[in-house]
Amino acid sequence: MSRAALDKDPRDVASMFDGVARRYDLTNTVLSLGQDRYWRRATRSALRIGPGDKVLDLAAGTAVSTVELAKSGAWCVAADFSVGMLAAGHERKVCKVAGDATRLPFADDVFDAVTISFGLRNVVDFSAALREMARVTRPGGRLVVCEFSTPVSALFATVYKEYLMRALPRVARAVSSNPEAYVYLAESIRAWPDQAALAQQMSRAGWSAVRWRNLTGGIVALHAGYKPQPV
């Protein structure tokens, strides 16, 4: 799978991530110029979690993001539909569950907070995933979506586009076990909704008080919202 069609086959996407699992974390750090660490810390801060909270880290991959969240003292579970990615993170001692974002294997209202980092783009029906995340979150609970987005400066956006389509695939060929997956990455980022459009989708899925904050000039955006209390 090398094209960012929005009717993604979940089996193809899972297989693609299985194929990059072994060197996934290293590749991400290289391609992001080390910014991935900053984005993970910012996500943890935006979730506003602490001891006693139950947190779902969806599309957690190798669970490197889950370990960051667990620094808050919260109980965190890593969920991903790529068994290969979860297996690659076997040394990270957090709870891991294989599951589809549109059919989560959890009861209603069980998590105090849910987050998904760089995974919503890869879900065949991301609106359904947003609704499913709301289902498993308690009323008043918080969602934070960390995802690639649209740079706020036109000049920066032009430079970034060139990096995505030209430099990124070349770097990926040097460090990744499956460079074709990063062609998909670049194209899926370009096809993804901008900050305002994603906020609107979150609101439509039932999340309230949705706001976003740009990171690294808008290359990444953190979108946050709450599950409404019952009336």
From Swiss-Prot:
S-adenosyl-L-methionine binds at T62, D80, D100, A101, S117. It catalyses: a 2-demethylmenaquinol + S-adenosyl-L-methionine = a menaquinol + S-adenosyl-L-homocysteine + H(+). Pathway: Quinol/quinone metabolism; menaquinone biosynthesis; menaquinol from 1,4-dihydroxy-2-naphthoate: step 2/2. InterPro entries: SAM-dependent_MTases_sf, UbiE/COQ5_MeTrFase, UbiE/COQ5_MeTrFase_CS. PROSITE patterns: SAM_MT_UBIE (PS51608), UBIE_1 (PS01183), UBIE_2 (PS01184). It is an enzyme of class 2 (transferase). It comes from the Bacteria. This is Demethylmenaquinone methyltransferase. It comes from Mycobacterium marinum (strain ATCC BAA-535 / M).
